[in-house]
Amino acid sequence: MLRFLLAITLGAVAGEAAAGCNKELLNVEGWSAKSAAEFRVKVSIDLRSTAPKPIRIIEALVYFRDALDGEIGSLPVERDAHIPVGGSYTRVMKSAPAHFDRLLKLRKQDVQTHVCVFAVLYEDGTKEIF
């Protein structure tokens, strides 16, 4: 019974998190992963903005999942990233957590990515919170 209640609670929390997220403002155009120092991985992510205005501050995560929908992990978009309308932005994580070593082993076609934007401040001062 306790497991059932825990599963329901986790499902509700996950649903709330997904509801507070915009998956349309930024898109992953590409990514790469290379071995770094001891048990670390350097991950580079290329993002493209579909926002209607230039972005000044952003709160967002890039999620990586495998072809069977298993979680690989998530990496933050730099909070103070200045991203022009229709522009691109590259995020380099020089020391991604150890579990990102899966990106070194998996085929690119077996990795799914998406960006979840939680909040954004545009250059004109307007805010959107999702």
Residue ranges of model-derived segments:
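Exposed beta-strand and adjacent loop surfaces of beta-rich binding modules
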Residues: 42, 57-61, 112, 117
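N-terminal signal peptide c-region/cleavage motif recognized by signal peptidases
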Residues: 14-16
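Terminal connector regions
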Residues: 92-130
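Low-complexity, acidic Ser/Thr/Pro/Gly-rich terminal tails and inter-domain linkers that flank the onset
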Residues: 18-46, 50
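Hydrophobic beta-strand positions in extracellular immunoglobulin-like domains
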Residues: 45-49, 64, 95, 120
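Sec-dependent signal peptide recognition
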Residues: 1-7
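Intrinsically disordered, low-complexity Pro/Gly/Ser/Thr-rich segments with frequent PxxP/GP/PP motifs
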Residues: 72-105
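Short acidic, flexible loop segments centered on an aromatic residue
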Residues: 52-70
